Amino acid sequence: MASFASLVKKELTQLEVHPEHAKAELSALIRMNGSLTLMAHRFVLNIQTENPAIARRIYSLIRQVYHHEANLVVHRKMKLKKNYQYIVRLTEGVNDILSDLSILDPDTMAISTTVPTSVLKEPQRMRSYLRGAFLASGSVNNPETSRYHLEIYSLYDNHNAGILKMMNHFHLNARTVERRSGYIVYLKEAEKIADFLQVIGATNAMLKFEDVRIMRDMRNSVNRLVNCENANMNKTIDAAQKQIENINYLKNHVGLDNLPAKLREIAVLRLAHPDVSLQELGAMMPSGQISKSGVNHRLRKLNQIAEGYQQPEDA
C-alpha cells in the first residue's frame, strides 16, 4: 500500500501548470536534487529521484518549458534491494536552462543556493516552488498515525530560510531546525499541514487528510467521552456501594426504625434498589416524588450518621 506522502506526490506530478510556474517548480527540483558534471568541456545535468512519477514530471517540464529532450537513466541502488534510482540527464542547453532558472550565474559560473528573488515576489511562483521543493525532499506522515508532521529538507541554510519565508507567507506557522547533514522546515499542526497541501495544489490529498483527521478527532472525542462516562459510572457505583454499606451498618447497629421517617424511607428504598440512579430513587419514594438533589441530601445524611457511629469503634 502506498504511503500518504507517495499519494501526495503522485497527485502533484499530474498537475498541469503554466510555463512560468513550471519554471519555479523546476528551479526547486533542480536546485535540490540536481548535480553537475563536466563532460567533453560542457556541463551535464543529472537530476536524481527514487520516485518514477517525479522523474517523468521533471522530464515533461523540461520538454514543456525548454523544448529539450532529456535522457532517463535507471539504476538499482543496491543489488539486494528493490529500490531504483531514476536520473533525468540533460546534455544540451544546460548552461542556458540553469541561468534562466537563476541557478547558475552565466558570468561567474557560480551556483546559487538561494530561492530566486523572482519567485519570492509572486505568490503563484512561491506555490510552484514549494511544490517542487516538496517533490524533491518533502515528507508527510500518514494522518492516521499518532502525530502530525510534514517537513522539507534543505542542504543549505540560505535555501532553508527561503522555504521558511515562503511557507510563512501563507500563514503556515512553519518552524525550522538544523540537522547534522542540513536543515528542515516543518509543520506540526494538522490544520497547517492541510493548508500547505492546498497551497501546493494537492487538493485531493488535502481532502483525504482532512477526512482522516476529522474521523480521528471524532474517535478521540468519543473515547474521551466514553472514558469520562465510565469514570463517572465508577464513581456512582462506588458511591452507591458506600451508601449501602453505611445503611446496612445502621440497620445492624442502630436499627432503621430508629431513624427519622424521611431517612428511614430512603434507606429502605436504597437497600431494595441498589442499582438504580438517584433520580429513579426519587421517583420511587412512597411518600411522594422528590428531586435528585433531595435524594442525594438524605443519603449524605445517612452516611454522616453511620460514620459518626463508626468513629468510636475505629478509635
UniProtKB/Swiss-Prot annotation:
Family: Belongs to the WhiA family.
Species whose genome carries this gene: Lacticaseibacillus casei (strain BL23)
Keywords for this protein: Cell cycle, Cell division, DNA-binding
Membrane spanning residue stretches: none
PANTHER family listed in its UniProt record: CELL DIVISION PROTEIN WHIA-RELATED
Pfam families documented for this protein: HTH_WhiA, LAGLIDADG_WhiA, WhiA_N
Record protein name field: Probable cell division protein WhiA
SUPFAM superfamilies: Homing endonucleases (SSF55608)
GO molecular-function terms, A-Z: DNA binding
InterPro entries: Homing_endonucl (IPR027434), Sporu_reg_WhiA_N_dom (IPR018478), Sporulation_regulator_WhiA (IPR003802), Sporulation_regulator_WhiA_C (IPR023054), WhiA_LAGLIDADG_dom (IPR039518)
DNA-binding residues (ranges): 277-311
Purpose: Involved in cell division and chromosome segregation.
The keyword RNA-binding appears for this protein: no
Example of a GO biological process term: cell division
